[in-house]
Amino acid sequence: MKTYTNKFHDKHIYLYIENSEISTINDFDHLIDEYQKPLQVGVDSDNDELIELLVKNDFILKRKCYEVEVTKADLKYPLENADICQCHYGSSEYKKCCQILYDYYALVHYDISPLTASFDDFVSTLPKEAIYMREDGVITICAFVEENEIAYLATSKSDSKTRRVFLSALLTFLFDKYQYIFFEADDTDYFATELKDIFDINIRNSYDTYIKYYKKHETSIE
């Protein structure tokens, strides 16, 4: 079993566990006591042996991440076009999209593993192209794309109808260029989930996040 940290989510200690190690692991309390931080493990949803170990040791399932590969034929309904814009690294529009994503990413990750990276460090990892839509002249919704991958979606204050319009226009734009589109959708990310739900697909497996909390995190009821 290996431990490591993630500077983007530095409030947790991450564990990597091989299935061959499962029989040798008795408990995780010594790691909790040593690091005094929650322990986080990523595991394939069909890895029953490892999941059994985690649940037995008070790890909680906090997130399911679905990897999605789709074509236009998978759509539940026809797409409608709308006006969307492209921007690239270095432009003021790109920076605004980065800020929207930074805030949105922090929001949807807060209850799982809070974002601890600075804005500049976060932006340095992003694709250099973003697609966005304005409401009343203000950018409120965007996607970061890299070829046929939708890497990130974010919104600041748009409603569900506006998000549907944006997603429809985004998919129209991408399907005009590519046969296949890829993206990941966490079940804790409502915007990405809305994107996944546009398609008539059945994804059986997911990549799941389990967390064991440090005792100071817990609230006792007297």
Which role does the model predict for each range below?
Residues M1-H12, Y110-S156:
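A conserved beta-strand-loop-helix scaffold within acyl/acetyltransferase catalytic domains
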Residues S20-D83, F166-T172, Y180-E218:
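Acyl-donor-binding surface of acyltransferase catalytic domains
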Residues I25, Y94-C98, T116, R164-S168:
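Short, well-ordered alpha-helical scaffold segments within catalytic/effector domains
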Residues D27, E49, K96, P114-D121:
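Exposed alpha-helical structural elements
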Residues P38, I150-Y152, Y178:
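A broad structural signal for short, well-ordered beta-strand segments within beta-sheet-rich domains
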